[in-house]
Amino acid sequence: MTVNTENNRLTASFGGARLIVEPWGESSVRVRMYPALCDIAEDERLSSSPYYSALTEQVSHNCTIRSEEVDTTDPWYKGDEYAQYHQTGTDYYLTNGKLTVKLDNEGRMSFYNQRGEVLTEEYWRDRNRINRYCVPLRIVARELKPRQGGTDYEITVRFEAYDNEKIFGMG
């Protein structure tokens, strides 16, 4: 995964897709996903509108991006084996007002409030890391599929379900 942190936004490229997370109003973000070969400049329709300019100017001073190096070594390695198989990765955080988006070293997104409590996170079930949910279903949180007979794409996004959750503005 390759991550770029320019222009107050996170841009991650991986698996034939490009993910963009950017501030969008006060304490909110806009998340977009494109096929890797798609030219994003062609799809920046909102960027020329006065509404977009007002949104980006309003949050430009409230948005911060930071990165943190994390240990990704599997937990069963101890002692000399740990040193031999030691790995690190980088987690990225975009904070806009009271909302923080974490993009971890494997490309998984999670959303936190100002107190650091998880609001929601993407629903991934695969066999990539055995110390997490390890199921043979290979359910990914984001699927980008081309629509038959055209140049458009359809995206399916999955999030974890929590008791008493309230999610607004998706769709």
Q: Where are the regions that the model predicts?
A:
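N-terminal accessory segment at the very beginning of proteins
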Residues: 1-171
